[in-house]
Amino acid sequence: MGCGGSRADAIEPRYYESWTRETESTWLTYTDSDALPSAAATDSGPEAGGLHAGVLEDGPSSNGVLRPAAPGGIANPEKKMNCGTQCPNSQSLSSGPLTQKQNGLWTTEAKRDAKRMSAREVAISVTENIRQMDRSKRVTKNCIN
């Protein structure tokens, strides 16, 4: 890398906070795939020994209601990434990780579409400005007409 970083720095970001028991317990608390506390009584979740078919961490349950991984739908502020200049887009964690992944994919597709549109616009503007020149470097006529 040109700025003095190594390849390992590009692959694995640095974490500036130290990993403590408090951090570990917070991480474990907010990354469990538990159901919401209000739905735990009616739902046979992991606490009751049952599993939800087709639901990994976040996503719609069998009745179609989204179940966030964090209790009460609160995002963990410690999960936010601080990646400096390596990340062009800041990703918020206002909803669960599944939504974030979908937004990441959508952002990538939107970027691709934007690049395609830009290429088309450039091609159109270039073809409109092509003019035929004779040997004396004078513009004779517009090729589009």
Curated annotation (Swiss-Prot):
It is found in: Cytoplasm; Synapse, Synaptosome; Membrane raft; Postsynaptic density. Pfam families: BAALC_N. It comes from the Eukaryota. Predominantly expressed in the brain (at protein level). Within the brain, found in most of forebrain structures, including the cerebral cortex, hippocampal formation, olfactory bulb, anterior olfactory nuclei, piriform cortex, tenia tecta and amygdaloid nuclei. Not detected in glial cells. InterPro entries: BAALC (IPR009728). A lipid is attached at C3 (S-palmitoyl cysteine). Residues 36-113 are annotated as: Disordered. Changing G2A: Abolishes myristoylation. Keywords: Cytoplasm, Lipoprotein, Membrane, Myristate, Palmitate, Synapse, Synaptosome. A lipid is attached at G2 (N-myristoyl glycine). May play a synaptic role at the postsynaptic lipid rafts possibly through interaction with CAMK2A. This is Brain and acute leukemia cytoplasmic protein. The gene is Baalc.
